[in-house]
């Protein structure tokens, strides 16, 4: 009888130990999954920010558009207001225009992101897989940075030239053609970016759209402390002209939260 009782106690202890271990492993698995999820979410947040900025300043009319429909003046007053904000790390001017890359046998729709000469290319160092970044230092550059996806689909490599077609602002007449040289190739790992986004000279878009040299599509801002982004966005909004809006990245890409 005593032996039977000891046996039961031993079995019960083992069951309890197994149950405790199972609970511990279950909690550990949940914590690991949560940590992995947070890590993945952080990576998505960081990558999305690198290619899109933390805060966008643009006209209200451009809010719902992926392209720069209407330009505004790049002026010292707005730039000064941006610089005065202590959470702003850096910023630059951009404009976005839809187009089509075409080779002899293939074509792909693209989003041409024109950036100003002070664009910080080092932010894309980790994504550059071949070649170099476009040189925007002097005259209007004909160099572009494209993704591995576009390079593969269009059978392009560094040094190749490719024609790009852009719809006229009036939507009348034949598209405008520009020939660019592939300076570099990047890979973000995000299909939404790699499938369409290429980088080039902001002045190309100004010329294509017949904008004045001081007209831009948006300012792209990067912050020092991401946790203060909403507060920073509000501060910027209250300091810039009323026709301009400031938009935090999570309003444009809600999935990164």
Pin down the residues of each PLM region.
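Hydrophobic, regular-secondary-structure patches
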Residues: 30-111, 135-139
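N-terminal Sec/SRP start-transfer signal
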Residues: 1-27
């Amino acid at each position: 009888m005593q032996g039977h009782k000891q046996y039961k106690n031993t079995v019960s202890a083992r069951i309890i130990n197994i149950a405790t271990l199972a609970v511990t492993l279950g909690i550990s698995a949940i914590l690991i999954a949560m940590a992995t999820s947070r890590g993945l979410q952080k990576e998505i947040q960081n990558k999305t920010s690198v290619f899109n900025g933390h805060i966008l300043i643009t006209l209200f009319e451009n809010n719902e558009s992926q392209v720069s429909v209407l330009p505004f003046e790049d002026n010292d007053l707005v730039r000064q207001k941006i610089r005065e904000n202590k959470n702003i790390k850096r910023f630059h001017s951009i404009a976005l225009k839809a187009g089509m890359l075409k080779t002899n046998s293939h074509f792909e729709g693209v989003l041409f992101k024109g950036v100003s000469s002070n664009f910080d290319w080092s932010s894309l160092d980790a994504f550059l897989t071949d070649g170099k970044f476009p040189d925007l230092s002097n005259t209007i550059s004909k160099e572009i940075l494209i993704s591995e996806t576009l390079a593969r689909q269009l059978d392009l490599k560094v040094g190749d030239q490719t024609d790009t077609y852009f719809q006229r602002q009036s939507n009348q007449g034949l598209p405008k053609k520009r020939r660019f040289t592939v300076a570099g190739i990047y890979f973000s790992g995000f299909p939404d970016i790699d499938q369409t986004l290429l980088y080039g000279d902001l002045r190309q878009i100004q010329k294509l759209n017949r904008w004045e040299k001081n007209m831009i599509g948006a300012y792209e801002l990067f912050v020092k402390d991401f946790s203060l982004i909403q507060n920073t966005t509000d501060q910027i909004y209250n300091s810039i002209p009323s026709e301009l809006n400031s938009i935090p990245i999570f309003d444009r890409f809600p999935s990164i939260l």
